[in-house]
Amino acid sequence: MTNMPNPQEGGSYNPSNVSPQPAQHKNVSPTESNQNEQRPANTEIQIFNQGPNGLFKTGQNDQNSNGQNPPPITNANGEGRRAEIKKSSIFGATLMITNICLGTTIFTFAVRAKSFGLVWLLVFCVIVALLNYWSITRCINSSSRSGKDDFSEITEYYMGRKGRIALNIFLIVYSYATLTCFVGLIYPLFGRFIQSAFYRTKYRDYDHFEDEKWGKMYIKVPFFVGLALIIGTICLIRDINKLNFSAYIGVGACAYAIILVMVQCHSYYKHYKNTVYKEDDDSTHANWVNFGDAFTSDLVFFKGFANLLFAYACQSGIFPIHAGFKMQKDGDKKMKISSALGMLFTTLLHFISIICGFLTDPITPEDLIIYRKDKDNGKDIPMVIARLLVAVSLIFTVPGYYFPLRLSVINSFTKGILTTKFNIIFTYVSVFACSVIAAIYDKILNYLSYIGFISVFISFLFPILLNIKSTGKKFTYWKNLLDFILAIVVCALALVAFVATLKDDITG
């Protein structure tokens, strides 16, 4: 359940297993050819074979798109083997793309319906989905033209080493921000579970419970320390396939919560009509189509747009999925079909979440899991279970946001070498740093605005620039120019959201 792909990590490189390589293809860059050189036997190095979210593996072909025979790699136990490729199906790739896009933040977007109006918020979901599909097709084009399946390698192929470093910096910042956001979500999820399960009569809602008890430092400090130790220990794992089960737990918990909200929203809306709605009082009327409130001094429109950009961000996960189609007839066409279906399914799930969240509380729609007020302060056992399931699933799925962070760091600064000492130190320092930030700064919607701004560079600017480079045509060619202008407009909208959110944080 994640807005980032999970790289498959595992094993060490054994030069004795490497067979002689044929001459390099003319499209192979010097950097790539150097990766096939033998290394000393005592060098510990990771061979990364990306497989987003671990739902199915994508391995190296017996012969890749450049006509080269890849060297054998080792598994997590150090045993030599040649990675097996599993060809992607349209259905499997669609599920992968949908799973990359979705996360527990899906339950927060109904909050924006109050300002956007329900209908207009749904319209903007469609617009953002179309923008992302447009960007994804550019990713597929640049991957096909370069013959490479790795985002960083494609960037270096067309933009040089400086371009690759710039991309990895954005990926590192994005991964840290996303990791911090989801670590921060675990705390209120557990707090809401405890309040609704054990303190429902003593504290009227979660805000009251947090002010009086859960938010106290004597609870918050040991909670985040323990959480960092647990997540950090899980993140030490090098082979992400050992966490395959977490994807199913996360999807199952999210699906259970969505189905529950769908079932309950009718009774909540009926409760609103009977107890809150007054025909002669506009303040009690639901905002169905009034878009004007989105353009206030708070710049809610731009913040909401950035939130949606983050919700659909999946471009860096497209490349390894695309690799499974390359050996198939009409592979690019199949990839574009699965991408379109992935955007469609993601949009449908967002529609369900937004509509149900809006109907649950049309006046002040809240987060559906944490801040939703239980009807008549009743004990909602199914929702109590949902909160616990989502909180526990996050503990096991958060490491999925850490793996691409570690991958970007070692590719940028350690030349792919990952020693045990570096793994332990970097992992615990990173997780504890994110936990400290999450404990101090807990504004989830603001996190989404910041991450949305960072994501546009990874999801729009880099893919469009790479596509322009790969066409071999001048920058001023009308299609290239149109793509670039559209990407800049998206980045500008996200920049306004970033500045507005930063201003809110500074001014209080």
Task: Indicate where each model-derived feature is located.
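The first (N-terminal) embedded transmembrane alpha-helix
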Residues: 88-106, 226-228, 309-317, 492-493
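Juxtamembrane transmembrane-helix boundary signature
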Residues: 98, 126-159, 174
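Central hydrophobic cores of alpha-helical transmembrane segments in multi-pass inner-membrane proteins
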Residues: 104, 129-138, 227-236
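Loop-to-helix transition at the N-terminal end of transmembrane alpha-helices
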Residues: 115-130, 251, 452-453
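Alpha-helical transmembrane segments and their membrane-interface exit regions
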Residues: 127, 131-135, 254, 456-463
